[in-house]
Structure formats: structure tokens, C-alpha cells
Amino acid sequence: VTVLLIFLVNYILLSIGLYLVFPKIGVEAWKGLVPGINFVECCKAIGRPSWWAVLLLVPIINFFIYAGIMIPFVKSFGKMKWVESFLSVVFPIGILYPIANDDKVKHTGQYYAKEQAYKAELEKVRKSGDKREYNKLVNNNPYHKTVGREWVESIVFAVFAAAFIRMFLMEAFMIPTPSMEGSLNVGDYLFVSKTRYGMRTPMTVAQIPLLHNRVPGLGTESYLKKPNLPYFRFPAFESIDRNDPIVFNWPVGDSVYISPSRSWTVGQIERDPNIAKRDRALGKLVKKKNFAVRPIDKKDHYIKRCVGAPGDSIQVINRQVYLNGEPGENPEHLQYLYNVTFSTSSINTRNWSDWGIAESDVYGGGKANTYIIFLDEEQKAKLKTLDPNVSIEHRPQETDGNKLFPHNTQYYGGWTVDDYGPVWIPKKGATIELTPQNIAMYYRTIQVYEQNEVSKQGSKLVINGEVADTYTFKQDYYWAMGDNRHNSEDSRAWGFVPHDHIVGKPMFIFFSTREGSMSKGINWDRIFTSASNR
């Protein structure tokens, strides 16, 4: 609301400024107050076609159009300084009012049209080979800018354009963890489309360009929480399908301790205080309760595979995902953790890296011929070529319901990452009956993601001051899991991905380093390959 009010006030002041200035260009003052007509007259005054004003209605490009109208407009009154151009875009009344009240300031004609005519004449003379006339035109250039100003304007435009593209259209991401290993590897750099699933407009508007949520080296957040905008998403070009890799904001990342190694939620530390004891830097933050509270679009970015869609019932039985009672489709390079025992200790590990088995994927098993390794089926087959008698067995996973969503050992204490669920994924418009058991499952969803006032009254849930026996969900949710199933912190750990947290769809890998290090080489075979069809 605050931001909209600022825009509204600024537009009203702009209209007043045009009302005061229009008589100087021979236009009735009242036209400056009429939306649409005022910009049509500005276009005429600078020599732009009138239809340019219509482009102000087109999202994304309208800011460039606005700047392309207002900057030449004030220049047509001889206001050539950089600060005057800046004011014409950011706070136009700050330059329009002085223009209107200075009798010495006159309209010099259609600035844009005259500038284009000059450039056309200059190009014509250059092609003719008349150096004398060309030098004369250059020396008498009425639109000359200093080298410093040219650089400043170029840098400002480049930064703004890059930030604009990153904010609305496409963003580059680097895979930092092995949770999608085999499909998307540590060191993969990829572009993510922000329009395929519907472009989400920024909610946090005051931010440092080209930074997501932290200022490198300073350890501070790169944005201000206020002013902000409400959630809005443009229509999607395609829906999110099961097994699509998706990029999203970490749903539980609204209150986080940020250590040098990673971010930890306040809830994670409360459930397992030993985490802070193992990390000295984190321990200091926890002791001071120095955690960051982040809005939706400034939570950390995660990339996982959408394995469950809205309305699905999902369950993991002996590592296999089941959707609505049927086995789900498995990714080609699905990985698990295995106990690997070779029949001999003289095993050649030289090719392991070429097979996609990174150093970080391998742990010692306590004996010279024993390893604990994250592997997919293809890698298992290659290990067997080294030793036909090798033993490769699934490594059992611990039972700790407190570490797994919904963190309730009373009802869900026997779950593991390999035997999990069933869980019903909320769907927009669907209504559920609230029970003591599923309240634990959907409490955060109803309270935080759906923005309700929620409390417990015995075994009942009180929503917005009223005891509720049922609840109807306001948006869709998804279930996301990493392909590296035993090395992925995903929906099994923190639950549902709300639709308003969806950032975009991975498109293609534009660069890839081996195991995330340039010193280990470049994965040339991964560059310019699809990031979604894996």
C-alpha cells in the first residue's frame, strides 16, 4: 500500500508539472492532467510518434518507454545535465516546476526528432567521405556528451537492464549442493526462466541491483523490507508437471541463522541444538538470537524436482515414491547411499571422477576395501566392471521423526526418508476436515503460507478468531525432492512448496565446472544442454 501511495502521489505531481509546462509548448494546460493525453502531447513535443504513449501500458518495457519520453522532454527545454535527466524519471516535478516558473526557459523544438535528424545527417556525410563536412558536424555537435557522462549513462543503463532482466525474465543460478547430483551437478551454471510458470512481480522493491539477499563481504541483507508490494503473478505459459525441476524460495527460510557454511532455520536449531554446538560461528549467532527475517522473494533459492502435484497423495515405500497408490516415475540418474565392499583393496579409483563420482560422494567405510558412496544405477554398473564380486548394498537410513516434516513424533515418529508418508498435498479450493493428527501436518501451511491468525484450543484449531472443523486452501502446493535422495534436504524435511514461492523453470546449462572447481576442469559435455529434461 505504501509503495502504491508513493507512485500515486508521484504521478499526481507529474501531472501538475505537465499542467504548468504545457502552455510553453502551445498545448492547453488541462491536457497535462488527463492520463494518456498528457503523454501523447509529450511524445508530440519531442518528435516521438503518438502511439508510443500506448506502450506505457505494457508491463516491463513501460519503464524504458517512460524514460524515453521524459528525458528528451526536459532536454527540449535545454535541461541537459545528468541530474536533470535523473529527476525527470524519478521525481519529475523537481525539474518540471523550475521549467514552468523560469521565463528564460523556452521550448527549443522536438528534441528527439532533431537529434535523430542530426545523427542521420552525420551518417550520410560519413558515408560520402567528406571529412571536412564530417568534422564540422562533429565539432558543432549540439548533443555532445562528455566521456565521463557517456560512461556513467552506459553503466547505469547496463546495470538497470541486467537487473530488470534478472528480476522479471531470466536469472542465472549456480548449483551449490549435490542434492540433484546426477541430473544437475555441483558447479553447473544454468539459466532459469521466470516467465514459463508465470512471471512473479517483485514484492521487495528497495534492493541493491543484481544481489539476491546478502551483500558479499559485509554479511548484511541487500534489501529493505519496506516498502513492499503484494504478491502478484502473470498468467503462466505452462503448468508445473510432475518430475519437472523447479526453482523456488525455501518455504521455511523466513527466519534463518546465516552462518558462513549455510542458512539454518530457527526451527531446525530449536529441534536440534547440537547443530549450533558443531558450528562455532552458528553458535555465536544462536546465542545472540541474531537471525534474519526474510520476505518470500528474498528467501534462499532452492532447486529440486517436483514429484507431487496439488491434490496428490504421496508416499515413499522402500525408497520408491508412490503417487495416489501408483509407483511414480523415477529420474534417470536417481541416487542413493550405498555400502560398497570390494573383494580386494587394490581398486583403481582414477576414473571415478569421470563417472560422476565426486570426492565428496565417497566416504571411508572403516576398511581399505570398503566405501560409503552416493551412486546411481549407471555408476553401480561401472563399479562392477572394476570388481565383478563387489558388494553394493543400500545403506539403512535412521528413524527420526523429529527431523522430518511435520516434526511430530506423536503421530509421525516412525518415518524415515526411505519410508515416508502418506501425505496429501494441498490443492487450491480443496477442503479438509481438521483432526488432531492432520493439524500437525497443515498448521504452518494454514498459519504462515495462507496468512491466517491461528492458535490451538485443546484439540481444535482456532482460525482468525473462530473454532474451525474444516479448512479450504487458498493456493496450490507442491512436493519437491532431490534426485540424490539420501543427500537432499527437501520436502521430507520441511514440507510443502507454496505456489507463491515458485521462482521459475531451469532452461539450460551455460557453463559447468567439475565438482564446482575450475581447478578440476570444465564439463564441456554439459555446456548448452537442457537443465529440465534430465
Annotate each predicted stretch with a short phrase.
Residues 1-6:
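Feature marks short, highly hydrophobic, charge-poor N-terminal signal-anchor/signal peptide-like helices
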Residues 8-109:
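Membrane-cytosol interface at the C-terminal ends of transmembrane alpha helices
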Residues 92-132:
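N-terminal intrinsically disordered, acidic low-complexity segments at the extreme N-terminus
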Residues 115-534:
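Extended hydrophobic leader/signal-anchor segments used for secretion and membrane insertion
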